[in-house]
Amino acid sequence: MVLAGMQSGRAIAADFTPDNSDAIIRWNNATLEAISSSKIAPTSSARAIALTSTSMYDAWAAYDPTAIGTQLGDSLQIAAPNVTQQNKETAVSYAAYRTLSNLFPTHQNLFDSVMSDLGYDTTFTTTDLTASINAQTEAAITGNLTAKALLDYRANDGSNQQSNYAGTLNYQPVNTWDNINDPERWQPISIDGGGTIQENLTPHWNQVTPFALSSADQYLPAPPEPFLDADGNLNQGFVNQSLEVIKYSAELTDREKVIAEYWADGPKTVLPPGHWQIFGQYVSQRDNLSLDDNVKLFFGLGNAVFDASISSWDAKVHYDYARPISTIRYLAGNNLLPTSDPNVRINADGKTEIFAWGGPEQGSQWILGTDWLPYQDITFLTPPFAEYVSGHSTFSAAAAEVLLQYTGSDDFGLCHVEPAGSSTFESNTPGVPVELCWDTFTAAADEAGLSRLYGGIHFKDGDINGRAMGREIGDTVWAKSQYYINGGKVPTSVPEPASILGLFVGAAWMTKQRMSA
């Protein structure tokens, strides 16, 4: 069993054992371990995954007769006699080690331990290829050099890594934790009466340089539902999306609770971008992929979640849209929810009550609408950034698209069993073991998006439009990764997906042919 993350001390797992003998998988797991034990945002975790997988790809590209690196192009070309499995492993390991040491300096012992297990000298830091005395030192230098080139390029990419990814745009919320000035806009939440108030997480992320996107807003979706319609009246679409979340909350089954919790990927987990790296590891094992195969797979997969982070955060910052916890409480507090809905009523005091999940171990019951809680860990009620679009949906759809393109099929075939009573959101849930199975990558991505409605975190539009964005992003990243892998033969300027279906199919076919050659 491989850990897909830690949440409140409990492992959320995908039920298979990864092959840590493969260098790419080994370093992918080291990346996920660092993420799960760090206080890190989904955005910066996606960047860490992308940089690590890209640095390994760049080192590997020097050993491939066709592929070119993302930073040094084809200027590094190792002589054929030195192109061995051992030397490739050395090169990608040094590249990953240098990259991760830069990204997670407080986890140096973890990365040193991996290098020690692999038998590599961490003090060998030279980037001068003329200093190589044999093929093994040449490989180590290649890894050091390609990692340095990538890190130098990314040092000023807009992420603000040097200041722990702190926001750089002086974002100020329109609403306060205890007062809503604009019901459409994001509200910071406090779970302790104002003692600790959410701060918007990485609101500058749309300033980060993407891997494949032409701009952060390349796939910006249409606006979400406004509070008022064109005539200045309450927009029923705004109300209806909140009623839909209330309905999900009222009717939560154990299976839906498991789905909400399995996909939550909150603090102390590998987060949503890391979840799909675990799925990539499963595909690697399922298809018996080699190091050459894995480096190409994770190159695309890592950059898919990275560009998804930039694009989804651009939408979040652009629209600054409210979360369900804010809209439901606001509409209820102002008696704006219709009593014609079976889950809404006015009590004897003239206040709006809703029939919904009442909190841990409370089941569904009539509660004041202003007290409504999403089905989440009580210490992490709702994420500290805007609703629209769903990051989960965007990350998942982008990753699923790359996995589909890489394998040439949507077939997935992974299952996970959640034991009875394993929930950390409430005790005795689920009452019996619940098995989650995903026949296709698309089904897994769709469930990840839907889980956010079960959990009361997102509205349907945020999910559906996030999925649509994710698929476009996945296609764009796939094409860009093939450009590098195929030696610059795939266009970097990607047209509309419908017009390049043949390109994607052809690129997938070429990749499969090279894998089987």
Predicted regions and their residues:
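C-terminal segment of classical bacterial N-terminal signal peptides
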Residues: 2-11
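Short alpha-helical segments used as structural interaction elements across diverse proteins
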Residues: 7, 44, 449, 509-511
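Acidic/polar surface patches and capping/hinge elements
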Residues: 12-491
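A short, hydrophobic C-terminal helix/tail in secreted or cell-surface proteins
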Residues: 493-512
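Short, charged juxtamembrane terminal tails flanking transmembrane helices
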Residues: 514-517
